[in-house]
């Protein structure tokens, strides 16, 4: 199973959100985008595609799933009755590794997969 093993704080800074299980550090100290010129980047207006991509990446990194796993969850949610967005979150919350994290047995999302 492949998973992201790179710097977690850089992901949080790129997304602009403090993801709860991604790490123990918060974005309070360095809240600018990552990179050499991150502090000087002007907040340009994102396109609709850019906003949707950002939200998808937040979901992926928050729940620790790959692109293929997320696609499978979305297809399952489309088949079920009800609001698709709510079903996606419901299916992701039902995963065993997420239940281990929510129950408090693992402090971070990386450790929840090992439990």
Curated annotation (Swiss-Prot):
It comes from the Bacteria. A C-terminally tuncated form of ribosomal protein uS4, this is probably not functional. Belongs to the universal ribosomal protein uS4 family. This is Ribosomal protein uS4-like. It comes from Azoarcus sp. (strain BH72). InterPro entries: Ribosomal_uS4_N. GO terms for molecular function: rRNA binding. SUPFAM superfamilies: Alpha-L RNA-binding motif. NCBIfam families: PRK05327.1. It holds the Pfam family Ribosomal_S4.
